């Protein structure tokens, strides 16, 4: 049985459910740390709706220090969505994340950063040509990045699968080389 640690914050006022994931790629520490801190800092008394945080999706990869891969099968989790309930470990994890968390969200933010071998600048993806595109574009406008990519990649990733199923989604890339700074973490939290 798969177990993914998560935090559910229920606001005192009704509203949408926002899902925030990090650690799909397990050595992308900026998003992981930002999600952990958000889970401790968000004030439910001022929150409208719910926030679900999954700070470390790929726990086995994290614990076993595999870069961008699920430890048990060596697969890149963000290339196997929608996954398969009867498949390999990565495929089962992708299937569970989609069915349990993503399908039940009204909006989705997937936090990433450059893994141990990646140098990059902060940017944001959203999927074009979907019913969720307009809302995703409004979400992107709230992200403090200089570059935005309107993607057309429709396979493999969590944010694009969510968008194809009507859940407005963005993927934020911030940080590089599996390193992080306080400034990057604060920017992800904003």
Regions found by a protein language model. Give the residues of each.
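Structured catalytic-domain cores with a bias toward divalent-metal coordination
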Residues: 1-190
């Amino acid at each position: 049985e798969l177990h993914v640690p998560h935090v559910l914050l229920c606001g005192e006022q009704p509203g949408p459910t926002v899902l925030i994931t990090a650690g799909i790629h397990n050595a992308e520490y900026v998003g992981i740390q930002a999600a952990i801190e958000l889970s401790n800092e968000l004030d439910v008394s001022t929150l409208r709706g719910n926030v679900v945080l999954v700070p470390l999706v790929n726990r086995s990869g994290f614990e076993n220090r595999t870069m961008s891969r699920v430890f048990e099968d060596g697969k890149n989790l963000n290339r196997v969505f929608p996954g398969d309930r009867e498949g390999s470990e990565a495929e089962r994890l992708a299937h569970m994340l989609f069915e349990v968390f993503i399908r039940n969200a009204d909006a989705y933010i997937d936090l990433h950063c450059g893994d141990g071998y990646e140098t990059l600048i902060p940017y944001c993806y959203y999927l074009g040509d979907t019913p969720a595109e307009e809302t995703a574009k409004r979400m992107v406008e709230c992200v403090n990045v200089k570059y935005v990519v309107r993607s057309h990649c429709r396979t493999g990733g969590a944010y694009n699968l969510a968008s194809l199923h009507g859940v407005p989604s963005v993927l934020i890339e911030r940080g590089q080389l599996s390193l992080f700074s306080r400034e990057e973490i604060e920017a992800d939290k904003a």
